[in-house]
From Swiss-Prot:
Pathway: Membrane lipid metabolism; glycerophospholipid metabolism. Its EC number is 1.1.1.94. It comes from Koribacter versatilis (strain Ellin345). NADPH binds at W12, K107, A142, R257, V282, E284. This is Glycerol-3-phosphate dehydrogenase [NAD(P)+]. It catalyses: sn-glycerol 3-phosphate + NAD(+) = dihydroxyacetone phosphate + NADH + H(+); sn-glycerol 3-phosphate + NADP(+) = dihydroxyacetone phosphate + NADPH + H(+).
Length: 337
């Protein structure tokens, strides 16, 4: 029996705990920061705050103690917001060991440092030991995963055996896991698509039609690909689950928090008011925009959509003005990387 610690009981962390718990053969411990989450799971086997529709199997134990969650764990699954990863791994460090496998399911890039999530974990843990790391990503809505709707993701690691281990431990008939060696592309695809999803939502909020969203998704994929390649990613990954797959889902699906932020911005609402109404949930694209611009500047990569999203989110630019500027850029060839 594999012992798995799931660190983070938001919607996505809870959904993954459900997948692992229903698979059988796992002892799953779900760590939650929020006392309300712990209480509701203990009382009703539901996460009333973040994923109230889903029933959590008895094979999943909930705790608010990191020590208890990590005790004896063979796999540590990190599903916390990107801005908490460094702090929590620093807090967990005394309880971590080199025989653990660390799996990151967080789709984000750290602000200021521009590090991907596995890089953050590696930087924190390496003074003690060299961590064994895997990143998982793909087109996933937590609600559908928890429900058992057919889903496919990618597990990426420079160590193929580690990727296959995660593939084996996470797969079931309703949750298919592929492997990939391109950690850079898988993580950047999962993080950067959130920025493009906000842009797609703005188009819907402004009622600009389907053509505009299709154009944004396509050109958004082009700039994500350019940055990923500049950082060492592989172009093939951008055509896969962690690239195109996740981008299409997040830009068009009604359950996308990042797209929803864009829709509300397009309707004229203020970002602070939108975030305040999200009940503690995180739209990673808002934070990732800063890091994406930093990475683009570092590598000399042109990312016009991302630049306009940064201006809207952090500089108060009008969404209508941003769209107008994107459409009036100098003409160029379509295919260039």
């Amino acid at each position: 029996m594999s012992r798995i610690a799931v660190i983070g009981a938001g919607a996505w962390g809870t959904a993954l705990a459900i997948v692992l718990g229903r698979r059988g053969g796992h002892a799953v411990r779900l760590w939650a920061y929020e006392q309300e989450v712990v209480a509701s799971i203990l009382a009703r086997r539901t996460n009333d705050l973040f994923l109230p529709e889903a029933s959590i199997p008895a094979t999943v134990t909930v705790t608010d103690s990191l020590t208890d969650a990590l005790n004896g764990a063979e796999i540590v699954l990190s599903v916390m917001p990107s801005h908490h990863v460094r702090r929590l791994f620093t807090q967990m460090l005394p309880h971590l060991s080199d025989d653990m496998v660390f799996v990151s399911a967080t789709k984000g890039v750290e602000d200021q440092t521009y590090l991907r999530m596995t890089e953050v974990i590696e930087e924190v843990v390496t003074p003690r030991f060299s961590p064994r790391l895997v990143a998982v990503s793909g087109p996933t809505f937590a609600k559908e995963v928890a429900k058992g709707d057919p889903t496919a993701i990618t597990a990426a690691s420079s160590d193929e055996d580690l990727a296959r281990t995660v593939q084996h431990e996470f797969s079931d008939p309703r949750f298919r896991v592929y492997t990939n060696r391109d950690v850079v592309g898988v993580e950047l695809g999962g993080a950067l698509k959130n920025v493009i999803a906000i842009a797609a939502g703005i188009c819907d909020g402004l009622e600009l039609g389907h053509n505009s969203v299709a154009a944004l998704v396509t050109r958004g994929l082009a700039e994500i690909t350019r940055l990923s390649l500049a950082c060492g990613g592989h172009i093939e990954t951008m055509a896969g689950l962690a690239g195109l797959g996740d981008l299409v889902l997040t830009c068009t699906g009604g359950l996308s928090r990042n797209r929803t932020v864009g829709v509300e911005l397009g309707k004229g609402r203020k970002l602070a008011d939108i975030i305040a109404g999200m009940r503690g949930m995180v739209a990673e694209g808002v934070l990732t925009t800063n890091a994406a611009i930093g990475l683009a500047n570092k590598h000399g990569v042109e990312m016009p959509i991302t630049q306009q999203m940064h201006a809207i989110l952090h500089q108060g630019k009008s969404p209508s003005d941003a769209i107008r500027e994107l459409m009036s850029r100098p003409s160029t060839t379509e295919v260039w990387l």
